[in-house]
C-alpha cells in the first residue's frame, strides 16, 4: 500500500468525531487506525463505534481518543502470512502491519472470497418496504413535467429501481409503492420490466403528505416495516439499521445523516446590548438531518389519520408528545444521496460514478 493511500486509514487521537467520519467516508472501509506523531499504533475506531457514540451522546466534537479501542489487533511484517487467520479468529476485517518499531507500514483487509453468512446476520426477506412515490417532484421541473420523479434516470436506471435494487441485495421481496402523480406510467414501467419481486401499489386520490398514504395500506404488517422516499439512496448496512430499531425498543427510527454546512459569510457573535464579542470567518456547522428513510413499528400505521394530509414530522411530534420512544440511526454525509434538486441529482450521479446524459 502506497503511503498516500495508507494515510487515508490513519488519524491522530486529537481529531474529532466529525473528522473521523469524513476520513472513513474517504477510505470506504469503515475503519481508522489511530497513531501518534511517530505513526506508532495506539488504537482503532470503526464506523460502528462512532455510530454507537453518537446515539448515546450526540457529541460530534469529541476527540476520538475518548472512544477508540486501545488494544487493536495487529501483526508484524514477519507475521503477514498469518494475517487472514488472525482476522478470522477475531472477526475483524482490517489488520495493520507494523515494523519492528511498532510503526504502521501497511493495512491488510479480509479476503473477499468469503460467501458464508456472518454470525448474527439478519434476513430482511419478510420485511415490507414502502416507497413513497406519489409526489410531483416540482424541484425537478422541467424533467418531472414529462416523467414522474420515481422514473427520473440516474445514469440509465430510474431512481426508484435503484432503490429497489439496494433492498434486493439484502433479500427484500415485499415492496409497496404509494403513487399519485403519473401513477400509470410508474406502474407500466415496472410491469414491463421483468423482475423477481412484487410491487403492491397504494393509490392516493389526493396528496396525503409523507406519511398519510401509509394508512391506505390494507395489509396488517406483523413486524416493523421500512419507509423510504423515492428520491434518495442510502449507502449503509440495512440489516444493522433494522437490528438497531428492534434492539433499541424504538417505535420509530429515523435514519439521519451528518450534514456539514459552511456559512459563506463571517458570522458575528454579539452580546444582548449589541456589542461585538467575536467574529468567525465562514464557520462550518455540523448537523444530523432527516434522510427520508424510517423504520416503523406496525401498529403506527393505524395511528395515522385517514384521508388526511399528514407528514412524517406530524407522526414524530405525536410520539414525542406522548413520551414514546423515537430514535435515530446516524450515517455519514457521503452515505446519503439525494436527487431532490438538480445539483443533488448530479452529485448522486458523480458519487455513483455515472455519466450524466
Residue ranges of model-derived segments:
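Bateman/CBS regulatory modules and CBS-like beta-alpha motifs in cytosolic regions of diverse proteins
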Residues: 1-23, 27-29, 34-37, 41-42, ...
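Short acidic/polar active-site loop segments enriched in Thr and Asp
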Residues: 30, 93, 173, 223, ...
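A short, polar/charged loop-to-alpha-helix boundary motif
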Residues: 49-65, 112-126, 288
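Conserved N-terminal catalytic core of the sugar/cofactor nucleotidyltransferase
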Residues: 55, 157-229, 240, 270, ...
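N-terminal glycine-rich phosphate-binding loop and ensuing alpha1 helix
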Residues: 121-186
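Active-site metal-binding loops of divalent metal-dependent hydrolases
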Residues: 136, 230-232
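Catalytic-core segments of class I nucleotidyltransferases/pyrophosphorylases
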Residues: 225-226, 233, 239-246, 259-262, ...
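A short, conserved acidic/glycine-rich loop-to-beta-strand motif
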Residues: 248-258
Amino acid at each position: 500500500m502506497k503511503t498516500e493511500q495508507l494515510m487515508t486509514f490513519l488519524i491522530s487521537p486529537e481529531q474529532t468525531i466529525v473528522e473521523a467520519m469524513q476520513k472513513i467516508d474517504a477510505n470506504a472501509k469503515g475503519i481508522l487506525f489511530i497513531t501518534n506523531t511517530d505513526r506508532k499504533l495506539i488504537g482503532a475506531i470503526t464506523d460502528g463505534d462512532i455510530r454507537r457514540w453518537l446515539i448515546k451522546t450526540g457529541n460530534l466534537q469529541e476527540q476520538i481518543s475518548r472512544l477508540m479501542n486501545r488494544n487493536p489487533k495487529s501483526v508484524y511484517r514477519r507475521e503477514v502470512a498469518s494475517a487472514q487467520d488472525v482476522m478470522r479468529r477475531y472477526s475483524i476485517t482490517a489488520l495493520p502491519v507494523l515494523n519492528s518499531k511498532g510503526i504502521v507500514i501497511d493495512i491488510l483487509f479480509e479476503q473477499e472470497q468469503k460467501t458464508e453468512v456472518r454470525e448474527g446476520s439478519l434476513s430482511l426477506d419478510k420485511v415490507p418496504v414502502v416507497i413513497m412515490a406519489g409526489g410531483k417532484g416540482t424541484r425537478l421541473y422541467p424533467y418531472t413535467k414529462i416523467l414522474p420523479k420515481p422514473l427520473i434516470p440516474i445514469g440509465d436506471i430510474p431512481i426508484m429501481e435503484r432503490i429497489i435494487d439496494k433492498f434486493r441485495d439484502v433479500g427484500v421481496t415485499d415492496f409497496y409503492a404509494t403513487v399519485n402523480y403519473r401513477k400509470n406510467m410508474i406502474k407500466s414501467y415496472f410491469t414491463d420490466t421483468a423482475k423477481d419481486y412484487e410491487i403492491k401499489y397504494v393509490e392516493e386520490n389526493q396528496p396525503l403528505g409523507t406519511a398519510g398514504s401509509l394508512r391506505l395500506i390494507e395489509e396488517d404488517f406483523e413486524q416493523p416495516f421500512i419507509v423510504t422516499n423515492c428520491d434518495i439512496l442510502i449507502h449503509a448496512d440495512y440489516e444493522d439499521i433494522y437490528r438497531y430499531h428492534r434492539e433499541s425498543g424504538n417505535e420509530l427510527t429515523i435514519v439521519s445523516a451528518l450534514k456539514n454546512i459552511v456559512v459563506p459569510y463571517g458570522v458575528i457573535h454579539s452580546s444582548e446590548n449589541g456589542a461585538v464579542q467575536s467574529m468567525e470567518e465562514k464557520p462550518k456547522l455540523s448537523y444530523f438531518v432527516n434522510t427520508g428513510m424510517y423504520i416503523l413499528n406496525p401498529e403506527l400505521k393505524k395511528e395515522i389519520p385517514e384521508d388526511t394530509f399528514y407528514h412524517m414530522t406530524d407522526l414524530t411530534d405525536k410520539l414525542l408528545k406522548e413520551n414514546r420512544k423515537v430514535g435515530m440511526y446516524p450515517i455519514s454525509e457521503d452515505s446519503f444521496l439525494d436527487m431532490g434538486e438538480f445539483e443533488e441529482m448530479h452529485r448522486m450521479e458523480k458519487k455513483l460514478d455515472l455519466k450524466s446524459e
